[in-house]
Amino acid sequence: MKQFDVYTDGSHLDKQNNGRLGVGGVIVNLSGPGMGTILGKFSNELKQDYMYDNFGASKCSNPSAELVGVLFALREFSKFWGPLDKVVIHADYLGVKEWMTGKWRIKEPYIAKIKSEIDKEIMKQGLQGRLSYEWVKGHQKFDGVNPDIYWNNYVDSLAKGID
């Protein structure tokens, strides 16, 4: 059994609410040299019409971007893990962990729809019981030691399209 560490981030790119979100993710082998080895990565910009058409979101928000980042990561990186492997999603938005584990109640219908799509993807891939979520404190200066800080900063730049 292997463990795959996936770092995801979402960003509300347009603070004037013109409907632009960025999502980014990286899958790493943390036992590789240095901070680990990149196995795959993605960076996507999403428009308001995508969010509305797929999730019924009438507005773009940072929480929705964070969750869509998780959904994209599960779809993008599924080719890496097998039926017995463990997957850990690392995100700097606490809502990812709390909503996905049921500790927070979802109030917005579009957030519930995104979570439902993530749940469907987990079922489709058979990841139940093998997927966990870790919260990473965001926006920290890299200390040269902690891989969580390193990779979180990396996916933050992917989500903002500055890789």
For each feature predicted by the language model, list its residue ranges.
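RNase H-like nuclease fold core
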Residues: 1-64, 76, 157, 161
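C-terminal functional segments of enzyme domains
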Residues: 15-18, 86-90, 94-163
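Phosphate/oxyanion-binding active-site loops and adjacent basic polyanion-contact surfaces
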Residues: 62-70, 107-111
